[in-house]
């Protein structure tokens, strides 16, 4: 059975044409992208690395990593986001290889081929996130690094990521997130360890609605990123 939620795919298909509009529903992704790329680059040294971006969407993260000197493959199951990614690539001239394929299928085709694997803001949109993490472990080379990000599952996360972001501040379209699919750091850590990945670091992303700025912080109550590593 495919680890794909077609309703989730449809949500982003409908919005895909606005993916690179920095004032659209994707503004939060554009705003946090430099923070995330810097954090990944500091830990993985992207230049010259072979990188796989799982759930790449319209290519915001994929292009940024390629601009740091990485050889990037971006995969997604949404046709429209991938079409937008390829179109933007023509404008930007940034080389990324985009493919419509699941992480699990990619792991069958290219096991142990990547120095770095990223899977950001995607795990909360699939039926079986642990399956994706197992695929990440298979895809990364021994000693390679896997970076994951998602949203914590607690009352504060519901208040900020759903009520605040979707209804009050209207940073995201209503229905973007399903609170039941949010993932606690303890769950993400357990799935990573079960897959054979060692958790190396965790960092939170916080948003100040007054300044409209994001920053990295030790507060992992809402948005957070995790660095993991496969044994050498």
UniProtKB/Swiss-Prot annotation:
Source organism's superkingdom? Bacteria
Reaction(s) catalysed by this chain, per the record, are: a 3-demethylubiquinol + S-adenosyl-L-methionine = a ubiquinol + S-adenosyl-L-homocysteine + H(+); a 3-(all-trans-polyprenyl)benzene-1,2-diol + S-adenosyl-L-methionine = a 2-methoxy-6-(all-trans-polyprenyl)phenol + S-adenosyl-L-homocysteine + H(+)
- Keyword S-adenosyl-L-methionine part of the UniProt annotation: yes
Presence of the UniProt keyword Lyase in the record: no
CDD domains hit by this protein: AdoMet_MTases (cd02440)
Where does this protein act, in terms of pathway?
Cofactor biosynthesis; ubiquinone biosynthesis
Q: Which SUPFAM superfamilies match?
A: S-adenosyl-L-methionine-dependent methyltransferases
Q: Where does S-adenosyl-L-methionine bind?
A: 36, 55, 76, 120
A Gene Ontology biological process in which this protein takes part is: methylation
Q: Which GO terms describe its molecular function?
A: 2-polyprenyl-6-hydroxyphenol methylase activity; 3-demethylubiquinol 3-O-methyltransferase activity; polyprenyldihydroxybenzoate methyltransferase activity
Enzyme Commission code(s) on record? 2.1.1.222, 2.1.1.64
Q: Name one Pfam family in it.
A: Methyltransf_23
Under which main EC class is this enzyme filed? Answer: transferase
Q: Which UniProt keywords apply?
A: Methyltransferase, S-adenosyl-L-methionine, Transferase, Ubiquinone biosynthesis
Family that this chain belongs to: Belongs to the methyltransferase superfamily. UbiG/COQ3 family.
User: HAMAP family from the entry?
Assistant: UbiG (MF_00472)
Q: Cite the PANTHER family for this sequence.
A: METHYLTRANSFERASE, UBIQUINONE BIOSYNTHESIS O-METHYLTRANSFERASE, MITOCHONDRIAL
* Role summary: O-methyltransferase that catalyzes the 2 O-methylation steps in the ubiquinone biosynthetic pathway.
This chain belongs to the protein called: Ubiquinone biosynthesis O-methyltransferase
Which source organism?
Pseudomonas aeruginosa (strain LESB58)
């Amino acid at each position: 059975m495919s680890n794909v939620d077609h309703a989730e795919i449809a949500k982003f298909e409908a919005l895909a044409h606005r993916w690179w509009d920095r004032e659209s529903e994707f503004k939060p992704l554009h705003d946090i992208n430099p923070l995330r790329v810097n954090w990944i680059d500091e830990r993985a040294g992207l230049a010259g690395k072979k990188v796989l971006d799982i759930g790449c969407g319209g290519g915001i993260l994929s292009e940024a990593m390629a601009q740091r000197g990485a050889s990037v493959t971006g995969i997604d199951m949404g046709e429209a986001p991938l079409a937008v990614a390829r179109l933007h690539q023509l404008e930007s001239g940034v080389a990324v290889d985009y493919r419509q394929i699941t992480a699990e299928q990619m792991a069958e085709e290219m096991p142990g081929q990547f120095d770095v694997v990223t899977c950001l803001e995607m795990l909360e949109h699939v039926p079986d996130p642990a399956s994706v993490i197992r695929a990440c472990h298979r895809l990364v080379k021994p000693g390679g690094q896997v970076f994951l990000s998602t949203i914590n599952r607690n009352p504060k996360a519901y208040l900020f990521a759903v009520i605040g972001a979707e209804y009050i501040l209207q940073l995201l379209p209503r229905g973007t997130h399903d609170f039941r699919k949010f993932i606690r750091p303890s769950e993400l850590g357990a799935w990573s360890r079960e897959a054979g990945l060692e958790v190396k670091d965790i960092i939170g992303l916080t948003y100040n609605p007054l300044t409209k700025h994001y920053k990295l912080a030790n507060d992992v109550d809402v948005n957070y990123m995790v660095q993991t590593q496969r044994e050498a």
